[in-house]
Amino acid sequence: MGLLLLLTALPARAQNLQFEPEVDAHLNLNSTFRTYLQAKDDRDGGDSTQFAIGQSLELYLKPLLKLKKLKTHDLDDSKSRFLVLEVGYRYLDIPDSPSENRMITAVTLNLPVVAGFHASDRNRADLDWKAGKFTYRYRNRLTFERTFAIHSYHLIPYIAAEPYYESQYSKWSTTSLFAGCIFPVGKHVEFNTYYQHDNNTGKHPNMPEQYVGLALYLFFSLEKK
């Protein structure tokens, strides 16, 4: 029902549907630290087509028992942690434009909510340097998801919203809405398929955009479980 409500709330005017591929490879260093390498077609926040690659380091607390039970079938064990801290770097290759260097800092809270739903609230700052010019943006992503079983298989549909404050426009300039589903495959692989609608108001006229995304998530650990 939530997915239907989100989709019917989207503007009816159709735009060209674009494709966003992504690969994230995660490695648990121990029970507290995790690193991951990300490569993606990054058009977050209304950016033009650009390729982003870089690494992040995450620090998180011990898992909450209730969250751990909710996320039993999700390979991403960071979702069972109440607090996740992240720092990272991305190199952005932009066609016909100077490259960009981005520092990332993020704080994510995970909470169990009613009826088996899991909520996450990610607060992230992107600090960007391009051709000697510094800009920043703040983005706040709120996600609700729930695991469903089809016989012995478990899948994880979700909805999310993420507004962006951009320093170059001095205002909240973009809102992204998502509806998607995560499909675990075995012990190390998840696929995230989603639909994304962006409303970009930084420039005139407003630029609504639509995307279909496919992300491959890989999970490995140095610790034996």
Indicate where each model-derived feature is located.
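Start-of-domain marker
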Residues: 15-82
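Residues that define the transmembrane beta-barrel architecture of outer-membrane proteins
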Residues: 17-19, 49-53, 99-103, 134-140, ...
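Membrane-embedded beta-strands of outer-membrane beta-barrel proteins
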Residues: 23, 53-55, 105-107, 140-144, ...
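Residue-level signature of outer-membrane beta-barrel architecture
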Residues: 27, 59-61, 76-78, 109-111, ...
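Repeated loop/turn-to-beta-strand initiation elements of outer-membrane beta-barrel proteins
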Residues: 31-37, 62-68, 82-85, 114-119, ...
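Transmembrane beta-strands of outer-membrane beta-barrel pores
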Residues: 39-45, 89-95, 111, 125-129, ...
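Outer-membrane beta-barrel "beta-signal"
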Residues: 58-64, 107, 208-225
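Detector for outer-membrane/organellar transmembrane beta-barrel domains
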Residues: 110, 118-163
